[in-house]
Amino acid sequence: MTEKAPEPHVEEDDDDELDSKLNYKPPPQKSLKELQEMDKDDESLIKYKKTLLGDGPVVTDPKAPNVVVTRLTLVCESAPGPITMDLTGDLEALKKETIVLKEGSEYRVKIHFKVNRDIVSGLKYVQHTYRTGVKVDKATFMVGSYGPRPEEYEFLTPVEEAPKGMLARGTYHNKSFFTDDDKQDHLSWEWNLSIKKEWTE
């Protein structure tokens, strides 16, 4: 069987163009206090807010960003050890590091993040993948809406399979974005993924 190199992914519309075609406008951002005071007589909304915020009072740090992305983990059962990327330190240093993934391995991306002050709507994780300077893929994952709490949230993408074959092996450069409906950039970072025949070569 002849091996094929990955083909560049052609994007007909990016997210901004799609939003404008649908005439979608996100609702204006409200503070947590405003949201808690709204619709006190609406039982369904009370349940929804309870789901987002829990039962206890929310204690927030006014100096902290509302959304903090802490780690990215590649969840792969066949990996010889954990594959985790710390996103709270020097993001420039991540550009020089390379994560190894064995070809054909099944994996999922897990994003760890915290919400500190206000409910955030329409969170999404976007990843652009390049090889030799050419964009070969773009993936957008809808994360959802979350309220503030002391514990971290985790978001897990669907299972993906790493490319395989001699032509698919090599280093892929990723540009990742954690954003929301208001197009607020909570975190952007770049990292490298090397597809190899074996975990260690």
Curated annotation (Swiss-Prot):
Residue positions, PTM Phosphotyrosine: 24
Record's protein name: Rho GDP-dissociation inhibitor 2
UniProt GO MF annotations: GTPase activator activity; GTPase activity; Rho GDP-dissociation inhibitor activity; small GTPase binding
Sites bearing Phosphoserine, chain numbering: 145
Subcellular location(s) per record: Cytoplasm, Cytosol
GO BP term (any one): cellular response to redox state
Top-level taxon: Eukaryota
Subunit structure: Interacts with RHOA. Interacts with RAC1. Interacts with RAC2. Interacts with CDC42.
Keyword field contains DNA-binding: no
N6-acetyllysine: residues carrying this PTM: 21, 25, 40, 47, 102, 124, 175
PTM sites of type N-acetylthreonine: 2
Gene3D superfamilies according to UniProt: Coagulation Factor XIII, subunit A, domain 1
UniProt similarity note: Belongs to the Rho GDI family.
GO cellular component, one term: extracellular exosome
Function description: Regulates the GDP/GTP exchange reaction of the Rho proteins by inhibiting the dissociation of GDP from them, and the subsequent binding of GTP to them. Regulates reorganization of the actin cytoskeleton mediated by Rho family members.
Region span, Disordered: 1-38
Keywords noted in UniProt: Acetylation, Cytoplasm, GTPase activation, Phosphoprotein
UniProt note on tissues of expression: Detected in bone marrow, thymus and spleen.
Cross-referenced PANTHER family: RHO GDP-DISSOCIATION INHIBITOR, RHO GDP-DISSOCIATION INHIBITOR 2
Family annotation (InterPro entries): Ig_E-set, Rho_GDI, RhoGDI_dom_sf
